[in-house]
Amino acid sequence: MQVKDQLSSLQPYKPGKSPEQMKEVYGDHAFVKLASNENPFGCSPRVLDELQKSWLDHALYPDGGATTLRQTIANKLQVQMEQVLCGSGLDEVIQIISRAALKAGDNIVTAGATFPQYRHHAIIEGCEVKEVPLNNGVYDLDEISSAVNNNTKIVWICNPNNPTGTYVNDRKLTQFIEGISENTLIVIDEAYYEYVTAKDFPETLPLLEKHKNILVLRTFSKAYGLASFRVGYAIGQEELIEKLNVVRLPFNVSSLAQKAATIAFGDDEFIEEIVRVNTEGLQQYESFCKENDIPFYPSQTNFIFLPVENAGEIYEACAHAGFIIRPFPNGVRITVGTREQNEGVISVLQQHFENKKRKSRDEANA
């Protein structure tokens, strides 16, 4: 069978190893997964209560327009329901946008170290990918602006950024948007929006009234703790959302997922508590790093990134202690867990860096 030539340069997405897979390599630990930025506290108890009490006819297709969920999102965010598109996770939403907007000869512009699916889907559509290096872990919007040309169809901005956890502030983002042609779509991926505590983080939804070329993406997979249900959504001007709906598969969000997300979106107290505990967890890691002179990027998400050498060694040390983290070529990303889980990982990191210092001293004295 012949497939697109460009597929030969791509690999299927490789998620982090599951606890079951880890046991095959590292023994029968009670593994804690801190690699995929899931909510360690799960979802709102209201979701579990309501799903147990409710009855869904599993022989029927779901509401193809996710009407109740979209209306719930629209009411809370003060937009029109027609401005909301729901997908099976943000992965599908990104695919929908790419399929609708891109063709051979186009290009996208994004950061060099960011969510990989932007690049993945652009290549599938036969597009050039222009990747701009991060500046100290942050999107460099000046350089991204310089990289945009007449063939640029999409600029992807992950804010806060995955995997670094850093963010672009309101002033810089607004200035950037004003300098980009309305012929170029600006997609702002706010998957970690609920975790943000920075006062100067951009409020992007008001920008939609003025700019027809902006899409804002959010998800129920992170703070809302519904990763297994796969629900993400895009918000934009009605005309743009209508065009994207042409590409969206019918019945793409299951009835169960629609109901769970609708219930979860109404539990503000749960999200407030999750953000509070997550902020304390970030402070645990940041305090440890400062005390031990370990580099890190200040995070506005539910993970922290340490730009360190020997990421593989840190991954192995954590794995042998029963913790699954995510290694990268230039560091490690660790999901914030419960206080006890954070303490466990910090203990492993402490031992690793102490051993490293001891080894350096021994080599210097040899």
Swiss-Prot record:
The protein's name in its UniProt record: Histidinol-phosphate aminotransferase 2
Record-linked Pfam families: Aminotran_1_2 (PF00155)
Lineage: Bacteria, Bacillati, Bacillota, Bacilli, Bacillales
HAMAP family in UniProt: HisC_aminotrans_2 (MF_01023)
GO terms for MF: histidinol-phosphate transaminase activity; pyridoxal phosphate binding
Pathway: Amino-acid biosynthesis; L-histidine biosynthesis; L-histidine from 5-phospho-alpha-D-ribose 1-diphosphate: step 7/9
Keywords for the protein's UniProt record, in alphabetical order: Amino-acid biosynthesis, Aminotransferase, Histidine biosynthesis, Pyridoxal phosphate, Transferase
EC numbers, comma separated: 2.6.1.9
PANTHER family per UniProt: HISTIDINOL-PHOSPHATE AMINOTRANSFERASE, HISTIDINOL-PHOSPHATE AMINOTRANSFERASE 2
Protein's organism: Bacillus cereus (strain ATCC 10987 / NRS 248)
